Amino acid sequence: MRIEVIKREENVLEFYLEGEDHTFANLLNEVLHENEHVTFAGYTIEHPVLMARKPKFRVVTDGKITPEQVLEEAAQKIFDRARAVLEAWKEVLGE
């Protein structure tokens, strides 16, 4: 995964998330929407063949926190949820 910043303003961040597709992009988008400071979050894949693994994100906040802070919080939430799933599987498998 590689992040390429396209546009950065006070409360707006646009970036490509290279190496990912709808699977992770949709998860990130959903978690971003859980943050009360996010006024807009969305992504598009500009060309279904040429850019299939390069979603373009736009994140806008209310200005109380930066888009970078929102993304950091979202990444941590995704990590925590993945860890919870792993722990649940370990419990089921008796590990």
From Swiss-Prot:
Alphabetized UniProt keyword annotations: Cytoplasm, DNA-directed RNA polymerase, Nucleotidyltransferase, Transcription, Transferase
Top-level taxonomic group: Archaea
InterPro entries (alphabetical): RBP11-like, RBP11-like_dimer, RNA_pol_Rpb11_13-16kDa_CS, Rpo11-like
Main localization (coarse): cytoplasm
GO molecular function: DNA binding; DNA-directed RNA polymerase activity; protein dimerization activity
CDD domains: RNAP_L
Keyword DNA-binding: no
Subcellular location as annotated: Cytoplasm
UniProt-listed Enzyme Commission number(s): 2.7.7.6
Catalytic activity as recorded in UniProt: RNA(n) + a ribonucleoside 5'-triphosphate = RNA(n+1) + diphosphate
Keyword Transferase: yes
Purpose: DNA-dependent RNA polymerase (RNAP) catalyzes the transcription of DNA into RNA using the four ribonucleoside triphosphates as substrates.
Quaternary structure annotation from Swiss-Prot or TrEMBL: Part of the RNA polymerase complex.
HAMAP family linked: RNApol_arch_Rpo11
PANTHER family per the UniProt record, alphabetical: DNA-DIRECTED RNA POLYMERASE I,II,III, DNA-DIRECTED RNA POLYMERASES I AND III SUBUNIT RPAC2
Annotated family: Belongs to the archaeal Rpo11/eukaryotic RPB11/RPC19 RNA polymerase subunit family.
Protein name: DNA-directed RNA polymerase subunit Rpo11
Organism: Thermococcus onnurineus (strain NA1)
